[in-house]
């Protein structure tokens, strides 16, 4: 009977292939934590999305314990991600199933399992303080501060307009 219950997992709540490269522990320990975690990583947020908006959306799937906004490590301003902790794994699974891939603030959000929030992880890991993915981005994205940081600093050229 228990083997039938274990096979109920759908791909939408399965573990992704992504693993936090800064995890303090072995790959096996990280896998073990991911399987029981009730913490989610939420990415591709607008820099202007508020904690209240996130709470309103994610509380539709269950009781939210806390939300930790991702911050630029130098400016302490939102930088496009957060962690959402639920009281139960089942509520977190509901969020994975129903919220991943939906729109919030005109952006398609990515929701993934997280091994659990540790103080310090709320800060962006990019050289300029934000997320690494925003450093070299050459497209103009108003929801994420315009061009990527390297373009804004003149270290990469902005894409030219073709006629």
Curated annotation (Swiss-Prot):
Pfam families membership: RRM_1
One of the record's GO cellular component terms: nuclear cap binding complex
Family designation: Belongs to the RRM NCBP2 family.
UniProt function note: Component of the cap-binding complex (CBC), which binds co-transcriptionally to the 5' cap of pre-mRNAs and is involved in various processes such as pre-mRNA splicing and RNA-mediated gene silencing (RNAi). The CBC complex is involved in miRNA-mediated RNA interference and is required for primary microRNAs (miRNAs) processing. Also involved in innate immunity via the short interfering RNAs (siRNAs) processing machinery by restricting the viral RNA production.
UniProt name for this protein: Nuclear cap-binding protein subunit 2
Tree of life domain: Eukaryota
UniProt keyword Nucleus present: yes
